[in-house]
Amino acid sequence: MSVRNLTNNRHSNSENSVSGSENSFYSSNEQSRQSSSLEPADGQNVRVSGNPFLGSEEFDEDYNSPSGDDERRGANEYSSSSSINYNNDPNSDTSLLANEKNSPERNGQRMSDYKGYYAKTNLTSANNLNNHNNNNYKNIISSSNDNSFASHLQPPDRNLPSHPSSNNMSSFSNNSLIKSPPPFDRYPLVGTRHISAAQSQSQNLINEKKRANMTGSSSSAHDSSLSSTNLYMGEQDFSPFGGYPASFFPLTLDEKEDDDYIHNPNVEEEAKLDRRRFVDDFKHMDRRSFLGLLGILFLFMAGIFIFIVLPAITFSGVVYHHEHVHAANSAGSSSSNTTSKSLTEYQYPQLAAIRTTLVDPDTPDSAKTRVAKDGSKWQLVFSDEFNAEGRTFYDGDDQFWTAPDIHYDATKDLEWYSPDAVTTTNGTLTLRMDAFRNHDLYYRSGMVQSWNKLCFTEGALEVSANLPNYGRVTGLWPGMWTMGNLGRPGYLASTQGVWPYSYEACDAGITPNQSSPDGISYLPGQKLSVCTCDNEDHPNQGVGRGAPEIDILEGEADTILGVGVASQSLQIAPFDIWYMPDYDFIEVYNFTTTTMNTYAGGPFQQAVSAISTLNVTWYEFGEEAGYFQKYAIEYLNDDDNGYIRWFVGENPTFTLYATSLHPSGNIDWRRISKEPMSAILNLGISNNWAYIDWQYIFFPVTMSIDYVRLYQPKGSTSITCDPEDYPTYDYIQSHLNAYYNANLTDWEQAGYTFPKNILTGGCSSSKFSLS
């Protein structure tokens, strides 16, 4: 076997011939074995292959070469015993190449199979390096006189076959050298036309190379010979496109194809198409697409009508259902004796309000009237049974009630009033107090008020309630009360100067502290007095205005008797001397259960109050607890025959007549309220009210309201908060900051000033005179 070099070696010398010695690499054992087994029997030479990488055909070709004898002699001169050294020097004693002194084609030729783009990168540097190594090695060999190692590998009487001579090297390299396989045709549709063009142009480049290197080394001639037989072994710029040279790729940027827009988009053209996309699509729309567009438009318009237009027209009352009119007419014809009055032409849709009438439909017929003090029957004008489950009372949620989100600082309460603590459940309105930290306060509770929504000027207000916790435990402050609409409960800026005034005179009673140095009053004076000057801020000049308070119930407990106590009172200003009214005109009906309160008032209000004991079963906890009891007030505001009567259950507790508030000292008559009165229900806790027995208050505690009902005399129905003779709406709208900002505690802090009066202001009034 002859050895083919698989490495890249280039050699250059002055004789244009560098021979690489072919080394036999037999091991010591193999040499001894072959010495005996390969000994010719007839004296002929034995063919011994020096290259294990050649097949038998290649071996025969090499062995039969005409220059075999010369090559065998060259091979025997330099040989190694058994070691293999993988140096690239052709004259190394371990080289795998045969000595090719007479082969000009082999001189400087890289024997790698690959002759493409990447093979030419370091061609020049490789030649220089190999030439340098070759010259150094030749100098070493020439200086050596020891030829023993050259003949060491040559067996006695045997000659190794030599490589072909230099004359046949070109034929050998063209026919026997392993060439690069043809490239994989990634684009089979390219066709032979482009292949032929590529071959033709490649051959032209090769010919130009030959002419340029006519006087060059034999290495260039050999490269040309190899390249002429293999298109892809030339020094071409190969691209990754299936093996084709990039310069011969069939497409250029100037050529156009139908699918160019997929892989080579035109930015300007795409921008033009984007701007005209809708118009072009609409212009080329087929029948099916047009019908689809109409369907989408129809669904869009239908959605607008159903979810926007229809709710708007039904909420505004534009849509008037004839079925509703027919039902109303039928109901009217069946009860010809019943007279009904329409409050408004507005038609409330079912989803916009829970109710469409002032009287709750759940109110039983037996509760439609109430017997007054004089024996007359007053009509039910408003009721709320709270039977609708899950009502909420955030601002704007309910027609009649609002749950404020405030701290009630007027009485230094320990809780925060939150709308979250108010709801309806099991047919009752629940005000729940729990030990829940809220706004840096440790308790949360609820309040509802009908301020500026539902008011009344006279009548009977009845509330059925179950009071919180145990009846014998003191500390909680449940309240059911009314106050004039000019003051909003919990908003101190709005109540300054109007609470609890009910006064129509222009004297010391309207001045700060009632002009008394003994501290009987700390009030700032009546802000809206009867003698307010012209062009001053007043809702209706010439009328004394205020916000008096009437308490239906304020709950507490008698720890000695172990029962609950209801405080029922009228709170007014200005004050009597020592806060004492004329008790000759106060009537108590049962002294075993009711007595006048020893607390008659203080520097902020005069309280005409009585206390009544309550059954512990009317509370939330305790044996046989859970029962509801009704509490009520009934009053008329006539200056001569007016009165206020308080009730626990069906029985009156006491009555205050208008004459008990006659002039006293330097003040004039205090009047039973003619103001529109709003209703308030709340559950509070404060050290200003009673001793708090913390260990026996089992939070959470709940005050439950079964119903609220309002009765008024026939012909005197007034449930508005803005009556003609005592208006409030315009005045409130002019001072919204004071009525909607609970953090403001002073009228001037809200940005307003007290109006002047003719008594202290040095001005005049066209509506009132002192003489």
Curated annotation (Swiss-Prot):
Modified residues annotated as Phosphoserine in this record = S56, S65, S67, S92, S103, S142, S162, S165, S170, S176
Q: Has the keyword Cell cycle been applied to this entry? A: no
Localization, per the record, is: Membrane
Lumenal-side positions:
311-771
**Which branch of life, at top level?**
Eukaryota
A Gene Ontology biological process term: negative regulation of autophagy
- Report domain GH16 positions: 353-716
The coiled-coil regions, if any, are none
> PROSITE patterns of this UniProt entry?
GH16_2
Keyword Phosphoprotein recorded:
yes
Which UniProt keywords are present, listed alphabetically? Cell wall biogenesis/degradation, Glycoprotein, Membrane, Phosphoprotein, Signal-anchor, Transmembrane, Transmembrane helix
Transmembrane region(s)? 290-310
Which stretches are Cytoplasmic in the membrane topology? 1-289
Q: Which residues get glycosylated? A: N337, N426, N513, N590, N615, N743
Stated membrane topology is:
Single-pass type II membrane protein
Which stretches does UniProt call biased (Low complexity)? 14-37, 76-93, 126-152, 159-177
Q: Where is the composition biased (Polar residues)?
A: 1-11
Concerning its family, UniProt says: Belongs to the SKN1/KRE6 family.
Q: What does this protein do?
A: Required for synthesis of the major beta-glucans of the yeast cell wall.
Q: What else is known?
A: Present with 468 molecules/cell in log phase SD medium.
Q: Which PANTHER family does the annotation name?
A: BETA-GLUCAN SYNTHESIS-ASSOCIATED PROTEIN KRE6-RELATED
- Full protein name: Beta-glucan synthesis-associated protein SKN1
Q: Which gene encodes it?
A: SKN1
